[in-house]
Amino acid sequence: MASEPKSLSLNLKVKDIVAGYGAVRALHGVSMSIGQGETVALLGTNGNGKSTLMKCLMGMVRPTQGSLELELDGHKYDLARLSTEQIVNLGVTIVPEGRRLFPKLTVEENLLLGAFRPQARPDIAKNLAFNYEAFPVLKERRTQLAGSMSGGQQQMLAIGRALMSSPRLLLVDEPSVGLSPLLVSTTITKIKELKEQYGLTVLIAEQNFHQAIRIVDRGYLIVHGEIVFEGNVASLESNDMVKNYYLGTA
């Protein structure tokens, strides 16, 4: 993946976001942040608003209140006022829940579809080579139809497709969904390797607490559309609220 110059900076501040679907409110004043080079987890069980926040960040759901302030290299943008295309062109890319591949296209064709951001087009060959180095199985199966791959292989392809856009901020929505425990561990490990090797900034929404905390710097626990706790890994593991509401062990 073509790397950005080290002088570039990124900071995302989610402020008091209220959002939902029609009359159903899914987020109730959510605030959080992520800075350059961080990996941050949005933790919580299904139905608590994690994916809704991800969709807000991508312009797929419009907040009714609050702001999504992205600062890039000294320039500020409110993602709540931008289209999905504009957000992607800023370098924000998502690995969606359920992977959302094109099953009747080959592995390589799916990867190439990820390079639609104008800034990524000059680096298509370089990013394709990067993906084949990072995910050898994709190179081995580059002519195979995506729909015929295993769930774990499809997850790797979904991550690779996102990396083809040379993202500044990578959103990963529920990477463990539909995968066996072994494949979940493999996927999380790969995200960790990519972060450490290339300095990616990653926001991961994940219900699997124990896997997520392996790779993150900080985390936020969201319950019923509200952030109820935030902290580093040590505080997440030791906090009674997290144990009670998420782990059920307090």
What are these regions (language model features)?
Residues 12-14, 27:
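Conserved structural motif at the start of ABC-family nucleotide-binding domains
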Residues 22, 40, 107-126, 134-139, ...:
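ABC-type ATPase nucleotide-binding domains, specifically the catalytic core motifs of the NBD
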Residues 58:
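Helix-to-loop junction immediately C-terminal to a conserved catalytic motif
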Residues 67-88, 233:
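ABC ATPase NBD Q-loop/coupling interface
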Residues 162-163:
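ABC ATPase C-loop
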Residues 166:
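Conserved catalytic motifs of ABC-family nucleotide-binding domains
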Residues 185-199:
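Helical segment within the ABC ATPase nucleotide-binding domain
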